């Protein structure tokens, strides 16, 4: 009990957050500095940010719109999920000077289940597109697919290169604003093309999500069609709202971390 009381006292003056890329460690950040950093990132109250715009609608109105859209796709939103995500940041201690990673997330959110299911669907489409290019590479010896789900393929490629002993140099690049600078319409158009390509490949015209996986099916009940998947993608990207305290913002370019 005494330890818990001491932690609560610390929280009066400090924000306790995990450290980026060091999840077992925590940082104690001055609460005033933490809030000022968030306001500066959002450029509030000046409203000069190209990425985040102040939304004049209240949170309840936006949540109701999210619930209505999800219901149109067959989702029933739990009361505990009828909220908007919030913005926070964690320090990048591996950077000099110390950097900041801004994150918009929440344990509960009105579009949480839809977003999770769309993510599972795109993992299915990813494997389909990857298999297509694997076959193309087999026949043409020309690789057009440069997307990886994790570091395993990269490590395997490095290992094969090391065995050949013919590598001259290796370079890595880090895009600090890779996700937050993608124009929404460009992203929506590219994903729509991937959806069109994937749905044209087989006879099954619906995708169902069950548990952790998505699969192709002939059954349209509780499934995504090509059109409803496009609608879901468009909505999740273009209607992304979050809060800082009781202030509502809309992300107008890029996607959240």
Walk through the language-model features, giving the residues of each.
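Generic preference for well-ordered alpha-helical elements
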Residues: 1, 19, 32, 56, ...
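Non-catalytic, polymerase-adjacent accessory regions of viral genome-replication enzymes
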Residues: 1-89, 95-100, 109
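Generic structural signal of hydrophobic/aromatic residues within well-ordered alpha-helices
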Residues: 3-7, 35-42, 58-59, 63-73, ...
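Eukaryotic basic, amphipathic alpha-helical target segments in cytosolic regions
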Residues: 11, 46, 71-73, 98, ...
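Internal, charge-rich low-complexity segments
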Residues: 29, 34-36, 40, 124-138, ...
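Conserved pre-motif C helix in the palm subdomain of viral-like polymerases
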Residues: 84-131, 176-188, 227-243, 249-257
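Active-site-proximal segment of RNA-dependent polymerases
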Residues: 113-172, 177-180, 211
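Conserved polymerase palm-domain catalytic core
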Residues: 157, 161-257
């Amino acid at each position: 009990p005494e330890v818990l009381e001491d932690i609560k006292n610390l929280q009066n003056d400090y924000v306790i957050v995990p450290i980026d890329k060091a999840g077992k460690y925590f940082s104690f950040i001055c609460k005033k500095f933490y809030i000022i950093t968030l306001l500066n990132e959002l450029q509030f109250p000046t409203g000069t940010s190209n990425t985040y715009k102040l939304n004049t609608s209240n949170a309840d109105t936006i949540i109701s719109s999210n619930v209505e859209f999800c219901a149109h796709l067959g989702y029933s939103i739990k009361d505990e999920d009828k909220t908007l995500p919030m913005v926070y940041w964690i320090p990048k201690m591996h950077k000099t000077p110390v950097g900041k990673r801004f994150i918009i997330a929440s344990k509960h959110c009105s579009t949480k289940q839809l977003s999770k299911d769309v993510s599972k669907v795109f993992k299915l489409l990813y494997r389909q597109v990857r298999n297509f290019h694997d076959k193309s590479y087999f026949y043409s010896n020309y690789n057009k697919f440069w997307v990886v789900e994790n570091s395993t393929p990269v490590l395997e490629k490095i290992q094969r290169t090391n065995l050949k002993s013919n590598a001259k140099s290796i370079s890595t690049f880090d895009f600090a604003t890779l996700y937050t600078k993608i124009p929404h319409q460009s992203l929506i158009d590219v994903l729509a093309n991937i959806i069109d390509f994937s749905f044209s490949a087989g006879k099954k015209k619906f995708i169902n999500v069950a548990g952790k996986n998505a699969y192709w099916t002939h059954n349209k009940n509780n499934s995504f069609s090509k059109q409803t998947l496009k609608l879901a993608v468009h909505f999740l990207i273009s209607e992304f709202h979050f809060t800082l305290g009781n202030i509502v913002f809309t992300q107008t370019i890029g996607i959240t971390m």
